[in-house]
């Protein structure tokens, strides 16, 4: 593909997809017919830069319409946004869900990550590839976790076409999308050939074995409330927290969140109240709120269940966070592999806006706030907050060096507070119960309830809500752990393994830290003795190799060297593997000490724990 403006022209379909998002072009500079006005003015400077953030939605519009992004389509989008084609090409090729090469309109994504691999995903792929040949009009792609681990193995079918191309910045609802989970060869082939006739997904409540249980603080409405009905949400306590927030005022809300001891639920466990206070106190304006719903850690699916089962709770929580921090505009960065969550959140935001719960005068309080959805496109690295900012702004999703920190210079260079879905939803019980009552749940250092994503060798996989302090063994017993347990992976691919004799580890940030492991985002993946550990470790190494953004040498090179070493020792043990294990340790230390962001810093964790705790390759 030529990296400059060329002679390639967009098709009528491509032009229509872009124009549906951006509106019709105003001049020949943007691709319209030439007029006398073109001799007198051209959009540039600030006006051009202010539209750069529409690049990602524009790429989605093209990819959704045709299934790939052609040179002519990319050129037209670049002219409309005044973005150099070379930069737009770099953005388009950064994301796994986009293609800049021709491919069939239907793509079958089969998860081959940890939970699905243990459930037979490799055999599923082979069967699908054998039955969906070149003449089928379907591309079969093996890929990372789809966030459907409780129903492994999982597959996602996406069909491009006019109905699939959205005309919103969020990318629109990918209507011709079908989820098959648990997937069988027959089911995925049927879904791939006729996704519009695929069976409906099961309700989100099936991913919550404890549901319906109104006593749950975070999951109590899942399975009880109609996720599409705002009135039903309000009848079950919805918007009580926002009304209390208005009564407290911004400073009072921050004080309540601080006193509750709420820590971020994304893995870093940073105090939420401190982050909000730091953002609110910044003199530079405007302030922004970003909700990170791009959960891509293998084994994680809690945010999907919350958005599918209780979407208005997230809208309310984002509104409270914006009120407290002085933000007037919020972005919900939602994972591209979550079509139903996207549909539910778009509907919830539209209904809230129509009922005066978003917009210029929320609940008549003189507070203005609105939410815009940005759909991700398959990049694990965009879970890192500064990479996510770059993605929203229309650049490659590469992490930024810190400082400056996001509370000072975040999205668009302005003070920004970024929280994930679970963290924000925890704010609701903080305000409805009060800080002291909330802090009484859990432990002194880890307060409140926590969501755990349990999958693998258990009879009842799903999302579990438990107070901090419950042990790993108690959680696995609740989930029905099977006989022959060999290891448990805590925190996903970036986490660590523990042995079956370590199930008394308390599930708190401080408890897992003292045990030499991590709680991470709440992934708890059980593996029995039928799962080959070397193959599991190799898949983790492949995952980090694929997902490294390549910006820094320690991660770019280290993840490849780690995978190469694991390939070499896959069939060796003991002394034969000693040299490569020594190399792995050296590479792992280099990645941990010198990588820019958490991806490289944690890429060695699971492999290290398997060697040291499980005796892998002995």
Predicted regions and their residues:
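Feature of Fe-S/electron-transfer and energy-metabolism proteins
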Residues: 1-618
């Amino acid at each position: 593909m030529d990296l400059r403006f060329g002679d390639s022209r967009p098709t009528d379909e491509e032009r229509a997809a872009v124009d549906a998002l951006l509106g019709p072009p105003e001049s020949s500079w943007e691709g319209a017919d030439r007029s006398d006005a073109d001799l007198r003015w051209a959009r540039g400077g600030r006006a051009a830069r202010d539209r750069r953030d529409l690049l990602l939605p524009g790429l989605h519009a093209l990819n959704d319409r045709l299934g790939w992004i052609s040179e002519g389509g990319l050129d037209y989008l670049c002219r409309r946004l005044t973005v150099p084609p070379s930069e737009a090409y770099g953005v388009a090729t950064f994301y796994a869900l986009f293609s800049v090469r021709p491919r069939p309109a239907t793509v079958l994504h089969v998860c081959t990550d940890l939970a699905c691999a243990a459930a037979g995903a490799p055999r599923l792929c082979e069967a699908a590839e054998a039955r969906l040949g070149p003449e089928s009009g379907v591309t079969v792609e093996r890929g990372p976790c789809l966030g459907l681990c409780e129903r492994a193995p999982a597959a996602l079918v996406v069909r491009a076409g006019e109905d699939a191309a959205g005309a919103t910045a969020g990318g629109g609802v990918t209507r011709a999308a079908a989820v098959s989970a648990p997937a069988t060869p027959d089911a995925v082939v049927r879904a791939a050939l006729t996704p519009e006739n695929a069976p409906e997904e099961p309700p989100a409540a099936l991913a919550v074995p404890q549901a319906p249980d109104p006593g749950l603080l975070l999951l109590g409405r899942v399975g009880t409330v109609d996720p599409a009905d705002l009135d039903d949400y309000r009848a079950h306590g919805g918007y009580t927290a926002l009304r209390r927030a208005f009564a407290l005022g911004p400073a009072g809300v921050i004080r309540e969140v601080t006193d509750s001891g709420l820590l971020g639920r994304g893995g870093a466990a940073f105090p939420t109240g401190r982050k909000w206070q730091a953002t609110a106190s910044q003199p530079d304006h405007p302030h922004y709120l970003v909700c990170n719903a791009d959960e891509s850690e293998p084994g994680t699916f809690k945010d999907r269940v919350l958005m599918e089962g209780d979407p208005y709770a997230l809208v309310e929580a984002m509104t409270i966070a914006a009120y407290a921090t002085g933000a007037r505009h919020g972005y919900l960065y939602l994972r591209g592999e979550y079509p139903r969550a996207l549909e539910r959140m778009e509907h919830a935001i539209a209904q809230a806006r129509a009922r005066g719960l978003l917009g210029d005068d929320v609940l008549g309080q003189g507070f203005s706030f609105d939410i815009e959805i940005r759909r991700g496109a398959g990049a694990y690295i965009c879970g890192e907050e500064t990479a996510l900012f770059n993605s929203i702004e229309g650049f490659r999703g590469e992490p930024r060096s810190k400082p400056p920190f996001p509370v000072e210079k975040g999205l668009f260079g302005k003070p920004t507070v970024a929280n994930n879905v679970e963290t924000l939803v925890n704010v609701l019980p903080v305000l409805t119960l009060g800080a002291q009552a909330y802090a009484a749940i859990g432990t002194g250092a880890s307060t409140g309830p926590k969501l755990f994503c349990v999958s693998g060798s258990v009879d009842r996989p799903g999302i579990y809500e438990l107070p901090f302090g419950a042990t790993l063994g108690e959680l696995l017993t609740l989930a029905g752990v099977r006989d022959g347990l060999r290891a448990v992976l805590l925190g996903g691919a970036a986490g660590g393994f523990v042995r079956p004799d370590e199930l008394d580890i308390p599930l708190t940030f401080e408890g897992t830290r003292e045990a030499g492991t991590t709680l991470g985002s709440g992934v708890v993946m059980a593996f029995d003795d039928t799962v080959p550990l070397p193959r599991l470790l190799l898949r983790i190494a492949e995952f980090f190799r694929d997902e490294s953004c390549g910006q820094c040498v320690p991660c770019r090179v280290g993840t490849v060297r780690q995978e190469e070493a694991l390939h070499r020792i896959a069939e060796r043990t003991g002394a034969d593997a000693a040299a490569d294990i020594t190399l792995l340790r050296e590479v792992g230390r280099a990645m941990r000490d010198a990588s820019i962001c958490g991806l490289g810093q944690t890429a060695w964790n699971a492999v290290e724990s398997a060697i040291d705790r499980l005796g892998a390759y002995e």
